[in-house]
Design a protein with these regions (language model features):
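A glycine-rich helix N-cap at a beta->alpha junction
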Residues: 153-168
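Short acidic loop-to-helix transition motifs that present clustered carboxylates
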Residues: 119-122, 166-172
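Conserved PLP-anchoring active-site segment centered on the Schiff-base-forming lysine
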Residues: 128-146, 165
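N-terminal glycine-rich, Lys/His-bearing helix-loop that initiates the first secondary-structure elements
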Residues: 1-83
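Short helix-loop-beta connector
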Residues: 106-110, 130-133, 182
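Conserved N-terminal alpha-helix of the aminotransferase class I/II PLP-enzyme fold
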Residues: 4, 59, 64-120, 145, ...
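Active-site phosphate-binding strand-loop segment of PLP-dependent enzymes
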Residues: 168-189
Length: 189
């Protein structure tokens, strides 16, 4: 039944969503600095705490086994539609969700992602946009771990790279792009 809800399938009403964010008052759009004070946080979801508490946990409870199974099927792609809710802080957590919501507001972006390190952000970028046979064109030198990721790790999967000096002119960068030939340039980094 395609119209079944989460509650129909698991017998449990899904986690309540936070209250809608206030983005204007009296027809006047609030500035990001004002929105950052409370955006993405609903005190009723946190025992009435006025400010967002720090959630020092790595795992979250499911109401029953069926809800847990359905959630993991959504995360792993075994079921279409993804998964909502919290399960394990390596996927998401209340603090991370609020931070990402607020970064999106601050940057006027549709969404934002927070990572535990710069290298995890860089690796995610490359893995999301590069396929075997692609070329990454980048300025050089790079941080050693980034160069290692590009040359040694992505190189094993058929991703190539070309670099240009950090002070290169637009013409020099275009020359490096021509060197890439007919291959697909996945990104200029």
């Amino acid at each position: 039944m395609p119209d079944e809800t989460e509650a129909d399938m698991t017998g449990i009403t899904p986690r309540r969503r936070p209250k809608p964010n206030v983005e204007e008052i009296g027809g006047r759009k609030l500035k990001p600095s004002t929105l950052m004070m409370g955006h993405g946080f609903d005190p009723s979801l946190s025992e009435g705490s006025l400010k967002q508490p720090i959630f020092a946990t790595s795992t979250f409870v499911f109401p029953n086994a069926a809800a847990g199974k359905r959630h993991f099927e959504g995360i792993t792609g075994k079921r279409e539609g993804g998964a909502e809710g919290l399960v394990y802080s390596r996927f998401n957590g209340p603090n991370q969700e609020i931070l990402e919501d607020r970064l999106g507001v601050w940057e006027d972006a549709e969404e934002a992602l927070a990572f535990s390190s710069g290298m995890s952000a860089i690796a995610t970028l490359f893995l999301a946009f590069c396929s075997p046979g692609d070329t990454i064109i980048h300025s050089g030198p790079l941080y050693a771990a980034t160069e290692t990721l590009i040359a040694r790790i992505l190189g094993k999967f058929g991703v190539k790279f070309l670099d240009f000096p950090a002070d290169a002119s637009p013409e020099e960068i275009e020359a490096v792009m021509r060197k890439a030939g007919d291959g697909r340039v996945a990104m200029i980094y």
